[in-house]
Regions:
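Short, charged beta->alpha transition segments
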Residues: 84, 123, 183-186
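Glycine-rich, phosphate-binding/catalytic loops in enzymes
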Residues: 85-86, 111-114, 214-216
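Conserved G1/Walker A P-loop phosphate-binding module
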Residues: 1-103, 140
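Conserved Switch II/interswitch segment of TRAFAC-class P-loop GTPases
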Residues: 42-43, 71-78, 89-151, 165-177, ...
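C-terminal-of-GTPase-core extension/linker across diverse P-loop GTPases
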Residues: 1-7, 11-17, 21, 139-345, ...
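Amphipathic alpha-helical transducer elements in NTP-driven molecular machines
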Residues: 46-49, 65, 81, 85-92, ...
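A generic fold-level signal
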Residues: 34-36, 61-63, 113, 191-192, ...
Length: 356
């Protein structure tokens, strides 16, 4: 799982990266925008995993992880030409960092206007996809003149359908593709189809109103989900002890940190759920897509388990907490046996039986 942080220059991308990952990368008002990208793998907080680990204190606790990449700034109007396009397409989700603070000491190429920047970026992402469609169609048409190809004709038909949808103002997501058509274009990794979070770096004075992000910035309809944070305030909080940090948050009217809110929102954006395993040496959380089968969950752990799948022993973590241990739950007959088509539920504790 990977989220890419990107946006126009001087918005606070690296500040946000530090807040989310605990890194200490240098931030500067005069970054030339040509530094290397940075990547950190972050544990996803989960109270349920903490409780499970509490039942098995001798075992190591291993949370699910989310990779976060900090990309350098992209100039206005240059997304379609950016060298970062490949990295954006590889990401599972996108975090567009938007400037919402005024500070003359940190130069910004345009007047600070979050609503305008969000609209502009969403249009640029759509344009980058449209350019990819046009480029591929041109090549396909040339190739099909040389030699007929059923697969090529099929791809051409789907891309023409996408182009028509974009030209009609419905965008790629409004093309109403069939599952087989979706599969045909999956390799394009269109940016307009990726989960998108707009994170606005707000002025300190706006801290008490961050929960009403859309109202605060008069955003109107957006494809991505808007959220806001106070980068300067939270950067100061990082330097404080836990007790002092809570008091500082309260002083600015902040109920939760951006890290807490992001790690709550990110799995939902990616349509993920979590299940848990209790092994000989570890208690571990795993992420899978919602509606994943037991067989797919087995594959998330190891292909050998998927290949040799026999049965899954399943109990919800909430039920398990009531029994106090997995063995106690088994003794009471509360652990179910499920087959490979069982749909994994968020919070399931699963033991996979498999042949080697």
């Amino acid at each position: 799982m990977n989220f890419a942080l990107f946006g126009y220059p001087k918005t606070g991308k690296t500040t946000l990266f530090n807040l989310l990952t605990g890194a200490h990368l240098e931030t500067t008002a005069y970054d030339d925008g040509h530094r290397e990208s940075s990547l950190r793998s972050c544990p996803i907080p989960d109270d349920r995993l903490d409780r499970l680990a509490g039942l098995y204190q001798e075992k190591k606790k291993i949370p699910a992880a989310l990779d976060i990449t900090d990309l350098h700034g992209i100039s206005y109007g240059e997304v379609k030409n950016s060298a970062l396009l490949g990295l954006l397409r590889k990401a599972d989700g996108l975090v567009h960092v938007v400037r919402g603070f005024a500070d003359e000491s940190i130069p910004h190429p345009r007047p600070v206007n979050p609503a305008q920047d969000i609209r502009a970026m969403e249009e640029e992402l759509a344009l980058a996809d449209f350019v990819s469609i046009e480029t591929r169609l041109e090549k396909l048409e040339k190739d099909l003149k040389k030699a007929k190809s059923p697969e090529g004709e099929k791809e051409k038909g789907v891309l023409e359908k996408l182009r028509a949808s974009v030209e009609a103002g419905r965008g790629i997501c409004g093309a109403d593709l069939a599952p087989a058509e979706e599969k045909t274009i999956r390799s394009f990794a269109f940016l307009s189809q990726k989960p998108l979070l707009h994170l606005i770096n707000a002025d300190d004075k706006d801290a008490p109103r961050l929960e009403d992000t859309a109202g605060l910035y008069c955003l109107g309809p957006t494809r991505g989900r808007p959220m806001a944070f106070c980068g300067r305030v939270e950067s100061e909080i990082l330097q404080l002890e836990a007790g002092e940090a809570e008091a500082f948050l309260a002083e600015f009217g902040l109920a939760r940190t951006v890290r807490q809110r992001f790690f709550e929102a990110a799995p939902r954006l990616l349509d993920l759920i979590f299940f848990f395993t209790i092994g000989k040496e570890e208690v571990r959380a795993w992420a899978v897509k919602k509606n994943a089968s037991a067989l797919a969950a087995a594959g998330a752990i190891h292909t050998d388990i998927e290949r040799g799948f026999i049965r899954a022993e399943v109990i919800s973590c909430q039920e398990l907490f009531g029994f106090g241990s997995l063995q106690a739950a088994k003794d009471k007959g509360a652990v179910r046996l499920e087959g490979k088509d069982y749909i994994v539920q968020d919070g399931d504790v699963i033991y996979f039986r498999f042949s080697t």
